[in-house]
């Protein structure tokens, strides 16, 4: 019984702390793991930080279409309850192709596209 009461108190505390967090729009960085060379495989990263609430949609795009084999890092947060997430996928830079990250969050009126 005491263990259940402690767990309930902890959940209430976490909920109250979460209520203090203001809605925050994400900050987005799109970059390659290493220096990009045309025709050489690399890893495209989309690092999204500073957002709240935690629900967010992040997609990597090649010429406007989703890139396959995307990996999602763990969702983590800081002391202000602002969240961050890394999304990445292998890609090969080629002339004429456009690589980007599309982010949709409740603080945005519509999804935003951030080009690499």
Question: Which residues are covered by each model-predicted region?
Answer:
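Terminal anchoring/processing modules of extracellular glycoproteins
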Residues: 1-116
């Amino acid at each position: 019984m005491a263990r259940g009461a402690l767990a309930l108190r902890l959940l209430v505390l976490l909920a109250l702390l979460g209520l203090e967090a203001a809605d925050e729009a994400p900050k987005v960085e799109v970059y390659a793991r290493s220096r990009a060379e045309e025709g050489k495989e690399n890893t495209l990263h989309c690092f999204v930080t500073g957002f709240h609430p935690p629900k967010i949609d992040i997609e990597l795009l090649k010429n406007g279409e989703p890139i396959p084999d995307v990996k999602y890092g763990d969702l983590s947060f800081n002391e202000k309850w602002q969240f961050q997430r890394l999304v990445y996928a292998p890609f090969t830079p080629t002339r004429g192709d456009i690589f980007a990250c599309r982010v949709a969050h409740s603080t945005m009126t519509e999804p935003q596209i951030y080009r690499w």
